[in-house]
A protein has these predicted regions:
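A ligand-binding cleft/hinge motif common to bilobed small-molecule-binding domains
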Residues: 79-83, 92-100, 170-198
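Short beta-strand-to-loop elements that line the ligand-binding cleft
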Residues: 66-73, 149-156, 160-163, 194
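Bacterial N-terminal signal peptides
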Residues: 7-17
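Periplasmic-binding protein-like
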Residues: 37-38, 109-112, 184-220, 243-257
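Secondary-structure junction motif
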Residues: 123, 132-147, 176
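Ligand-binding clefts/hinges and TM-proximal coupling segments of bilobed small-molecule sensing domains
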Residues: 140-156, 223-258
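Extracytoplasmic small-molecule ligand-binding "clamshell" domains
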Residues: 25-100, 134, 238-239
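Flexible hinge/capping segments at coil-to-helix
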Residues: 115-133
């Protein structure tokens, strides 16, 4: 009967009205995110362990987005995101490349160090222009550190100590964990010196796709919630790393990597 049918629709409407809806739910948001990263020791390991992967899971999975972690060389990781074959790459600097999207929030900082022979003068941030520098291909520190003049990009970290020993470079530039790993490969670490240079904020860089745009909105919302609540602090503590949001982390130089 018509009046009974109307009551049925009314009952259905009332039932739907009381179904709880997550505050951060979006009907068109993906239920997974494909994240790609270079393999960094203790940060983004190939087996899915590390500080970086733990941060990503805490950011996305409580919001219903499953993290799919993938490890690739850095330049390939960037290319996958630029082509929309992955949703974001881990460890980007602000405005690093064109054609991808950057959130408002950073999630960590890169503590950048110089590795040199201990017998050589100690470098400073403002004397880098007088040294021959080396770093991993694709990192492009010339856009984020001041007064860079002479530099060479290397494909692998393994020959770095040999390059310094044979004066093929004066300084090797990298993040602190990677330099620590390099020094573990020598029986004479006292022959080398590490010098702090700068702290550069780290971002996810998202694909310029509908998925990427939706996931970027979620990332910024979740970062605001987690920093305010302090829920990221125990993750940094578990990996014995400083909590980046206690500091004022401003890159020495910003701008588009070319």
């Amino acid at each position: 009967m018509k009046w009974l049918s109307g009551l049925s629709w009314l009952a259905m409407g009332l039932a739907m009205a009381v179904i709880p809806v997550r505050a951060d739910s979006q009907p068109d948001r993906p239920d997974d995110i494909v994240l790609v990263s270079e393999q960094w020791n203790g940060y983004t390991e190939a087996d899915g362990t590390g500080l970086g992967w733990d941060l990503m899971r805490e950011l996305f999975e409580p919001a219903g987005v499953q993290v799919q972690a993938r490890v690739e060389p850095y330049t390939r990781a960037v290319g996958l995101v630029q082509r929309g074959e992955a949703d974001a790459w881990v460890g980007a600097y602000k405005n690093e490349v064109e054609g991808t999207l950057y959130p408002q929030w950073h999630y960590d900082v890169d503590e950048i160090y110089a590795l040199s022979l201990a017998s050589e003068p100690t470098p400073t941030l403002h004397t880098l222009g007088s040294y021959r520098l080396a770093w991993v291909r694709g990192y492009e520190f010339e856009h984020y550190l001041p007064d860079i003049v002479h530099f060479n990009e290397v494909a692998r970290r393994e020959p770095i100590l040999n390059m310094l020993d044979h004066s093929r470079a004066d300084l090797y530039i990298d993040a602190k964990p990677e330099i620590s790993f390099i020094l573990q490969q020598t029986k004479e670490p006292e022959r080398f010196r590490t010098t702090y240079l700068a702290a550069i904020p780290l971002y996810l860089s998202f694909a310029n796709t509908a998925r990427g745009r939706s996931l970027r909105i979620l990332f910024d919302r979740r970062m605001a919630q987690l920093v305010r609540s302090g829920k990221l602090r125990p993750i940094f503590a578990r990996w014995k790393q400083p909590y980046p949001f206690d500091l004022i982390d401003i890159p020495v130089k910003t701008g588009m990597r070319q």
